[in-house]
Amino acid sequence: MGQTIKEIKARLAELTDLSAKEFLEFETDERAGVQAALKSRKKQILAECAEDERLEQMLEFEKELYSQEIELIAGIDEVGRGALAGPVVTAAVILPKNCKIRGLNDSKKVPKSKHHAILSEIQEKALAIGIGIVDAEKIDEVNIYEATKIAMIQAVSKLSLKPEHLLIDAMVLDLPIAQTKIIHGDARSASIAAASIVAKVTRDEMMKDFALEFPEYDFEHNAGYGTAKHLAALTKYGITRIHRKSYEPIKSMVNFKY
């Protein structure tokens, strides 16, 4: 007696190589359910191969360092530089050698619905994670560029392991640690992408808490960025203690307070 469609689907799920002999065998099965299952599994395998290749490319900078016997590599990224309200948050993440996390990318390119699942895997696999936070008051005092550097140095200082090398998204830090500045690093380095996700989720959770304190500004949805609803609330209610007074239109509203 031949295999049932259910049995064939179960076997297909185990296959990861399109050249497997089972594919040729099942292609001779004329049942529509079998052909649909074949087509679906082939599509999945192609997608998995493409993802593996993408993740391999995201280890390019790390592999160059591995070849020099450098393994404690911290990726560093920030979130919140362009927001009108809330802190700038940074993260430093040291991943184990050749670590691949499916779906990992620049947080801006990852669907929000997947952030927490990817964060959980980062937390499970990472050798060390550090987070830096600089509030709006400090941002106004020193400017956002300097505040971001302060937050990044904070993040590095909070790592439980001392990194041998830093991979940083478009920054150079005043630290006695070898470092590489990578433009668009959060989409090109797995370590930086991991830091991007950690910083993003951390900041989003903070903004949800601020939304409870200041419900009129829709912080739980806009994360402090200048959406129409946020700007309308500024016009109606004024600025709060977490707004950046060095940013326009806040700068022109400093006497109109919540």
Swiss-Prot record:
Which cellular compartments is it found in?
Cytoplasm
For whether the record's keyword set contains Nuclease, the answer is yes
Q: Which InterPro entries match?
A: RNase_HII (IPR022898), RNase_HII/HIII (IPR001352), RNase_HII/HIII_dom (IPR024567), RNaseH-like_sf (IPR012337), RNaseH_sf (IPR036397)
Reactions accelerated catalytically:
Endonucleolytic cleavage to 5'-phosphomonoester
Q: What PANTHER family does the entry give? A: RIBONUCLEASE H2 SUBUNIT A, RIBONUCLEASE HII
Q: Which family does it belong to?
A: Belongs to the RNase HII family.
Q: Indicate what this protein is called per its UniProt record.
A: Ribonuclease HII
Organism the protein comes from? Lactococcus lactis subsp. cremoris (strain SK11)
Name the gene.
rnhB
